[in-house]
Amino acid sequence: MNLVVIEGIDASGKTTLAKRLAESLSPRFKVLLTQEPFTDDIKQLLEKYQWKDQVLLALLFSADRRIHVKWMESQNVDLIISDRYFFSTLAYQGVGVDRTWLESLSSIFPLPNLTILLDVPVNVALERLRNKRDSLDFEEKRKSLHQVRENYLSLARRYNFKILDGTLPLEKLTSISLELVQGLLSSSTSRGSQGT
């Protein structure tokens, strides 16, 4: 399973880039686009109760992710592109939960072949969010996004993410990302042909 993950803070452009990558690669490869949270039940629970307990959220996201990973492993495709993965739990719940516990919880999940971090300044993300939603507490969101962004940058160093400037035009981000993904697919194809 070739797994590419797109990560970043809220409003960094993850979903848009993931869709564009899938569209660009689909003519030549069997591509599956997915996202987390994965199951509708978890999404509905999160929307209904709006929980703030970060331990509870980490457990819910991990249960959802376990279902997601099992489903991904059952797919017969060349590439899976996921909008978020366990790094989101480490970045977001890592603001208020013991990092060692979170990493232990996430250790059962396979590492992606490639993780792209769309890095945007918090003020850019907040402006994008302001254009989407009316009722955000921007001061609270600003404080938490600063820490989440720092967590992502720390994870990027540790897990060797490819960091892209999320303020670049979509065409440029797509071009850079396609190059990275095609490099991954070429190397996995050549490894597969060497084994035959």
UniProtKB/Swiss-Prot annotation:
ATP binds at residues 8-15. It catalyses: dTMP + ATP = dTDP + ADP. Keywords: ATP-binding, Kinase, Nucleotide biosynthesis, Nucleotide-binding, Transferase. Its EC number is 2.7.4.9. The keyword Transmembrane does not apply. PANTHER family: THYMIDYLATE KINASE, UMP-CMP KINASE 2, MITOCHONDRIAL. This is Probable thymidylate kinase. It comes from Metallosphaera sedula (strain ATCC 51363 / DSM 5348 / JCM 9185 / NBRC 15509 / TH2). The gene is tmk.
